[in-house]
Design a protein with these regions (language model features):
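An acidic- and aromatic-residue-enriched active-site/binding cleft used to recognize and process polar
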Residues: 22, 139-140, 166, 202, ...
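Nucleotide/phosphate-binding catalytic cleft detector across ATP-hydrolyzing
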Residues: 1-18, 32-39, 45-55, 59-62, ...
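Short flexible coil/turn linkers enriched for glycine and charged/polar residues
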Residues: 22-25, 103-106, 297
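Active-site core segments that coordinate phosphate-bearing ligands/cofactors
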Residues: 315-395
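Glycine-rich phosphate-binding loop of actin/hexokinase-like ATP-binding domains
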Residues: 30, 38-49, 279-280, 286-348, ...
């Protein structure tokens, strides 16, 4: 009883305010306790002011907070425009404030290591999981002369130099050789323009490295990214990298320091906070399946996958629906983008849209043509990012092992391009086309972009993420059944039966190869689903031809049957392909 009373008092005391600063939008979210559980009370969204002409995030933050104040009638800022903390007796302010940020320029980084395939590969994996832009990589196998390496370091205009190499207690001379190159290169740079140096190599050399750089250069020590040959540790080094990113952004964009003060010095990178939520979910869902998170932003595309708590996170800063959008033409191609369109458009019209969107990333589609273009681009951005992300997934789940996506539960998706569609069917079809899930999984939409805020708040307020994830703030699009197997189109591959728990009549039917269908089951409703696949067809019950049953939850669409095959094969004839894309939109209910 005493424990319940103390838990209740903690919940009653904690009003949580969260800010997420993106490159296009700044979001404010207010959470409070309702009937003993945390709930999302209000959100505010404003254009980000991190870029030109202001280069100061403060204005966007205050506009987003003003929206929350207007909706709730709750005062959050005092007369001096400062956050009121903790909550006053009149109910103004917040008890806990958390902040995340992805806005700001890319952090130009020089990576210096010993051997490719060991510490250098670990460091590259860490760079891929955050907002670093590798502009130069130098290692022992680099055949350039030392003078050229030094010149490249000096000319890189880097914000950060990351030095790795040597297991703990391992290589010494070769590490110091690289350290000397860095020291000479950095000393050629004017003092005010010198980058921060992060050393995350052989820890036994930490004091020697510090002595070599002395007080002349800005160096931070971090735990070794590869303490042993078969052991990788990126978690602790990420903290030092996060500080370097914050420092680099703070030099070019104002306002971050204020958010740090409000959050008690703990402004998180959006990617780190997002990964934390995906990792948490993997510990409470089916351990045999991966939790996949996809976020399509204006300046990046994130793919997070967690396998029983083993998080693999990739932030692709070359892929986004804003400024970097034209790069998709190099990473993929125009034909791959246009293959997803249900309408006939000239190539030049698609190119014009891509370049216009990169200049004006805040533009919202106002007509069908723009909507279809954005969703086609989103498909290709996700597919390209996923292909790259899977290179670092565990063996057996990576692209070298199988072209199939591993079994997933759930798939969490976010990004304005998905959240703002006129019907959830558009978002669902985009994800099915881009990810091609197999077996049985659930697709969940994060329409308010709450995941980073929940990740940031999981430290000071652990119950917040648990409660909000279980509330209606996340939208389940539905349960997906995607059979895998080879057979000709139109052939029966599956028999199914749905028995709703609420007393509605049971539904039975057959599924044929090539079908895409939706069986309505509303959010909050549950049913027992029985699947009996034909020989050679795998629906996720442990092998081809194996039948099974499970309890499923409803969603915005219901039960989605995607029997179009894996891999998804599109018609080579452009006209027939467009007709098929149009048909799929009708099949999934996006068009009515």
């Amino acid at each position: 009883v005493e424990r319940e009373r103390s838990m209740s008092s903690v919940l009653d005391a904690d009003t949580v305010l969260a800010i997420d600063v993106g490159s296009v939008s700044t979001r404010a979210s207010l959470f409070d306790v309702v009937d003993g559980r945390y709930r999302l009370i209000a959100t505010g969204r404003a254009p980000s002011t991190a870029g030109a002409p202001l280069f100061d995030i403060s204005e966007g933050v205050r506009m987003a907070l003003d929206q929350v104040q207007a909706v709730t009638g709750r005062q959050l800022l005092d007369e001096s425009e400062l956050l009121i903390m903790p909550v006053t007796s009149q109910g103004a302010g917040a008890d806990v404030f958390v902040a995340t940020a992805s806005a700001g320029p890319k952090v130009r980084t020089v990576l210096v290591g010993l051997m490719p395939g060991v510490s250098t590969t670990s460091a590259q994996r860490m760079a891929d999981s955050t907002y670093l832009e590798l502009v130069e990589v130098i290692n022992l196998l680099d055949r350039r002369r030392d003078e050229e390496k030094i010149s490249r370091i000096a000319a890189a205009r880097a914000d950060l130099i990351l030095v790795v190499g040597g297991t703990d207690g391992g290589a010494r001379d070769s590490v110091m050789q690289m350290i000397d190159l860095v020291a000479v290169g950095v000393e050629l740079i004017p003092a005010r323009q010198r980058p921060r140096i992060v050393y995350a190599g052989n820890r036994r050399l930490a004091s020697v490295v510090a002595e070599r750089f002395g007080n002349r250069l800005d160096i931070a020590q971090a735990p070794n990214v590869r303490p042993a040959l078969r052991h990788e540790d990126l978690v602790h080094a990420r903290l030092a990298i996060g500080e370097a990113i914050a420092e680099a952004r703070g030099k070019r964009v104002n306002g971050f320091q204020e958010l740090e003060q409000w959050s008690g010095g703990y402004l998180m990178l959006t990617a780190d906070a997002y990964g934390r939520v995906i990792k948490y979910l993997s510990r409470i869902y089916d351990p045999e399946k991966a939790v996949i998170g996809v976020d399509v932003g204006a300046s990046h595309t994130m793919v997070a996958a967690s396998f029983e708590g083993d998080l693999r996170l990739r932030v692709d800063t070359d892929l986004g629906l804003g400024k970097p959008l034209p790069i998709i033409l190099k990473r993929s191609n125009l034909e791959n983008i246009m293959r997803w369109l249900p309408l006939d458009l000239p190539k030049q019209a698609v190119l014009d849209y891509i370049h216009n969107k990169s200049i004006h990333p805040g533009l919202v589609p106002s007509e069908d043509t723009a909507l279809h273009l954005e969703l086609a681009l989103a498909r290709e951005l996700i597919r390209t990012a996923l292909k790259q992300a899977r290179t670092s997934w565990p063996r057996g789940k990576d692209l070298k092992s199988t072209w199939l996506l591993p079994p997933t539960e759930p798939i969490i998706a976010s990004g304005s391009v998905l959240a703002r569609t006129p019907h959830p069917g558009y978002a669902a079809l985009t994800l099915l086309d881009a990810l091609e899930p197999i077996g049985i999984s659930t697709m969940v939409l994060d329409p308010h972009g709450l995941s980073p805020s929940l990740g940031a708040a999981s430290g000071p307020v652990p119950m917040l993420a648990v409660h909000v994830l279980e509330s209606g703030s996340y939208i389940s699009l539905g349960t997906v059944v995607a059979p895998v197997g080879r057979t000709r189109p139109g052939r029966k591959i599956l028999t199914l039966q749905i028995e709703p728990e609420q007393g509605s009549e049971a539904i039975a039917g057959e599924v044929r190869m090539g079908q895409l269908a939706v069986i309505p089951l509303r959010q909050g409703e549950y049913a027992r689903l029985t699947l009996r696949p034909e020989r050679g067809i795998d629906v996720g019950f442990g092998g081809a031809g194996k039948a099974g049953a499970l309890r499923i939850a409803g969603g915005a669409l219901g039960l989605i049957i995607d029997a179009r095959g894996r891999p998804l094969k599109l018609d080579t004839d452009p006209a027939r392909r467009r007709d098929t894309n149009e048909k799929w939109l009708w099949d999934i209910g996006a068009k009515e």
